[in-house]
UniProtKB/Swiss-Prot annotation:
Inhibited by aurintricalboxylic acid but not by Zn(2+), Mn(2+), Hg(2+), 2-mercaptoethanol and sodium citrate. Neither inhibited nor activated by ATP. Disruption phenotype: Cells lacking this gene are more sensitive to mitomycin C, show an increased ability of competence and are not able to metabolize extracellular DNA. It is found in: Cell membrane. Pfam families: Excalibur, SNase. A lipid is attached at residue 20 (N-palmitoyl cysteine). Its cofactor is Ca(2+); Cu(2+); Mn(2+). GO terms for cellular component: plasma membrane. SUPFAM superfamilies: Staphylococcal nuclease. Residues 66-199 form the TNase-like domain. The lineage of its organism: Bacteria, Bacillati, Bacillota, Bacilli, Bacillales. Ca(2+) binds at residues 79, 98-99. Residues 24-65, 284-296 have a biased composition (Basic and acidic residues). This is SPbeta prophage-derived endonuclease YokF. It is an enzyme of class 3 (hydrolase).
Length: 296
């Protein structure tokens, strides 16, 4: 009987020890797995935070402006100015926008072109002038600087777009830093039908349609009256005759236009050069393509 009881006790003790061993094993296993799960969660959290930080850094980098101080020489038209940059006078073509023409050779004055030119002149003369370059080429094929223009920290391009005096155009990667904002500004003016957007079909993907008749007439009147000043009169003295002969040798006047052999001859009569609307203007003498020939 004692042997039976002892055997039963031994069996019971064996079962108890096995159960304890199983519980301890599960406990150890759980303890091992729990830190791993916690580590995975922490890693995912860190990755999300890292992604957010990178996105924020990219946004800050995009918004960062490296502005360069320049001095205004003069406004050319609605989307072009001349400035002194690095000690030289340079032509600046505004990035990502286009305004109606006023001085393009062999082209008429387009509606709202004069308005855009006038507004641009007002803006660039109103405060501290600065330029911002994009990632791509800083000059176009004509040698003009390509830049975003600011006056007292405010974008001139955005102002012209918001007022309906310019359209978004000439979009070439990678010079597209502000394309999204510019399109919003353009849409704002378009929705309100401001200036260039007030005429259906006036703005196209290639530019603008139509000419200003009144401006064309004014130019014709100015050109037809010009030859009268160069008509030879009866010489009163030998010096006057000599001057007339010199003018005839350096230029030819035909049908309201004046033709000079080169800029040297042209400057004898027009020391500061002539704009594209002038009878003596020739595109071959406009080397920087700013619609002004033989300027000093």
């Amino acid at each position: 009987m004692k042997k039976v009881l002892l055997g039963f006790a031994a069996f019971t003790l064996s079962l108890s020890l096995a159960a304890c061993s199983s519980n301890d094993s599960e406990k150890v296993s759980t303890e091992k797995e729990t830190p791993q799960a916690s580590t995975d969660v922490e890693k995912k959290t860190e990755q999300k935070e890292s992604t957010k930080e990178k996105t924020a850094d990219k946004s800050k980098e995009k918004d960062k402006k490296e502005l360069v101080d320049v001095t205004l020489d003069r406004a050319v038209d609605g989307d072009t100015i001349k400035v002194t940059y690095n000690g030289n006078v340079d032509t600046v073509r505004y990035l990502l926008i286009d305004t109606p023409e006023t001085k393009k050779p062999n082209s008429c004055v387009q509606p709202y072109g004069e308005d855009a030119s006038k507004r641009n002149k007002e803006l660039v003369n109103s405060g501290k002038l600065q330029l911002e370059f994009d990632k791509g080429d800083r000059r176009d094929k004509y040698g003009r600087l390509l830049a975003y223009v600011y006056v007292d920290g405010k974008s001139v391009q955005e102002t012209l777009l918001k007022e309906g005096l310019a359209r978004v155009a000439y979009v070439y990667e990678p010079n597209t830093k502000y394309i999204d904002q510019f399109k919003k500004d353009e849409q704002e003016a378009k929705s309100e039908k401001l200036s260039i957007w007030s005429k259906n079909g006036y703005v196209t993907d290639r530019g603008f349609n139509g000419c200003v008749k009144e401006k064309t007439t004014a130019v014709k009147k100015a050109t037809t009256s010009k030859p009268a000043a160069t008509q030879p009169t009866t010489p009163k003295a030998s010096s006057e005759t000599s001057t007339t002969t010199e003018k005839e040798a350096s230029s030819e006047t035909t049908g309201g236009t004046e033709t000079f052999k080169n800029c040297t001859e042209l400057r004898k009569k027009y020391p500061n050069g002539v704009p594209s609307s002038h009878p003596a203007y020739q595109s071959k003498m406009d080397r920087d393509h700013d619609n002004y020939a033989c300027e000093r």
